[in-house]
């Protein structure tokens, strides 16, 4: 099917727009880490991330992203290379994602529920040499690593981002 015949070309949803609503908007082309920088400068003490009652401000988030980006660079990750992230939706996942983008690398987000076979394929297909994951998955990733291109595993803990007394669990 030619693009001109596709529903995306015809845009039938535009008929449902209220009068005065534009069919397209102008937007600034800006990278996500640059948006973070801008937001951290404008609202440094506002909450950027909240996880299970633990809050991180934009200033703190920017600092964490910058420090982890430096860590990835120290590991030898270069622009265009892949970094595998195997984390649930939690603060370290966001930090790893932004840090990877900060250095111009490619994020390879993986589902913690993937089987070892699926993860092996994801890591090898992407060429990821660095993996960011939970300490709870440590033994599993150590066993999987020899079958992949992963050279460095970075562990994070859910407990590091929980308020007291949950952080003791």
Residue locations for each model-derived region?
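Conserved AMP-binding/adenylate-forming core of the ANL superfamily
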Residues: 26-28, 33, 37, 45-90, ...
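Flexible, non-catalytic linker and terminal segments flanking ANL/adenylate-forming cores
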Residues: 1-29
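Ligand-binding pocket scaffold of soluble enzyme catalytic domains
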Residues: 13, 28, 38, 101, ...
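A short, compositionally biased
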Residues: 2, 40-45
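Structural core segment of the AMP-binding/adenylate-forming
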Residues: 1, 75, 102-169
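Charged/polar positions on well-ordered alpha helices
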Residues: 41-42, 63, 102, 109
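Short low-complexity stretches enriched in small and charged residues
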Residues: 2-9, 85-88, 107-113
